Design a protein with these regions (language model features):
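A conserved beta-strand-loop-helix scaffold within acyl/acetyltransferase catalytic domains
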Residues: 1-42, 87-228
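Aromatic (often tryptophan-rich) hydrophobic motifs at membrane interfaces
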Residues: 32, 65-70, 187-290
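A short glycine/small-residue-enriched secondary-structure motif
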Residues: 38-54
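Short, polar/flexible loop-turn hinges at active-site or ligand-entry regions and domain interfaces
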Residues: 57-62, 125-128
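Acidic-and-aromatic substrate-binding clefts and catalytic sites of carbohydrate-active enzymes
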Residues: 61-62, 91-97, 260-264
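Well-ordered, non-membrane alpha-helical segments in soluble/globular domains
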Residues: 63-71, 98, 178
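Short, charged beta->alpha transition segments
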Residues: 68-75, 106
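Conserved GNAT acetyl-CoA-binding A-motif
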Residues: 78-90, 246-257
Length: 290
């Protein structure tokens, strides 16, 4: 989604350079990377959780190296002196992610920054089966107290405001304003799903899910009301989302990174692992040119 022409225009209206690796047939595209250039700086993405290269079929190590060398040469001819590539979580496509890392870090000598990313593989078993005992207990209690539902579009603003209020209570902020969020949803109405846990007294927890692809869901924003901190209803909310994802043949639920001021946010990472998430790397590659 993030590399689609529509989303690229939301990130920045102009300044995009797109490189493609063609297959044997003229119409075949084996890989593509969209890079935003402003002055002497180039970045992929301009404004999204990740950008980087999209690989549509298996590519040899040599072909991938040649492609990135072509990208570098093209950017340098246009006066680029700094390049940053924010890669997708390695868990999305482990083999391809390793290929990209080997080419950029080892062959082309990009500097590498590693973040910790957490994903939940979706399978036949319930998420509760993977949880630690303490989290299972929270899930059982929340199941008795709250009802799970998918929100109608008319509720989106209310859910956004709820999540924002929860973040404000914790002295945190959201990366997108409601205006920006609404604009993105209007362009991708089928990609956004809002879920909530609620009872007669109101909303206890909410989440905004992005369908990154047919096989991957990304929990973009989620939160629960501070008065439920001990109960942590987000645990039950996530297991409900897991069940919904399984019914739609989704393979991965991306819980995002667990970083705070460029360091691992250990309490957040512990929470994600305690509910059944698997930890992996998410790389950002940087290089300067003379």
């Amino acid at each position: 989604m993030y590399n689609s022409p529509t989303h690229l225009r939301l990130q920045a209206k102009s300044g995009w350079v797109v490189f493609e690796l063609a297959g044997k047939k003229r119409s075949e595209v084996k890989a593509r990377i969209s890079i935003h250039v402003k002055g002497h700086a180039a970045i992929s993405p301009a404004r999204a959780p990740f950008g980087s290269i999209e690989m549509y079929s298996r590519i040899s190590h040599a072909a991938l190296l040649n492609f990135f060398q072509f990208v570098e040469a093209g950017l340098r001819q246009n006066g680029v002196k700094q390049l940053e590539i924010k890669h997708w979580p390695a868990s999305y496509q482990p083999f391809q992610a390793k290929q990209v890392q080997q080419v950029l870090a080892h062959k082309l000598h990009f500097a590498v920054t590693e973040e910790v990313s957490s994903v939940i593989p979706v399978g036949a078993s319930t998420l509760r089966m993977r949880m630690k005992p303490s989290e299972r207990q929270k899930a059982r209690k929340s199941e008795k107290l709250f009802s799970f539902s998918c929100c109608a579009p008319g509720e989106y603003k209310t859910m956004y405001d709820f999540i924002q209020a929860c973040r404000t209570e914790r002295k945190q902020s959201l990366s997108l304003s409601w205006k920006e969020m609404r604009q993105t949803i209007s362009k991708f109405p089928d990609r956004f799903v809002f879920f909530k846990l609620a009872n007669a007294t109101g909303v206890a927890a909410a989440v905004i899910v992005i369908r990154v692809s047919d096989k991957i869901w990304y929990t973009f924003y989620y939160a629960h009301a501070a008065k439920y901190n001990k109960l942590s209803p987000v645990v039950h909310l996530l297991e409900c989302i897991y069940a919904r994802a399984a019914s739609e043949k989704v393979k991965l639920i991306d819980l995002g990174t667990s970083m705070l001021q460029n360091k691992i946010n250990k309490p957040l990472l512990h929470f994600k692992e305690s509910i059944g998430a698997v930890t992996g790397p998410k790389f950002t590659f940087r290089k300067s040119y003379e």
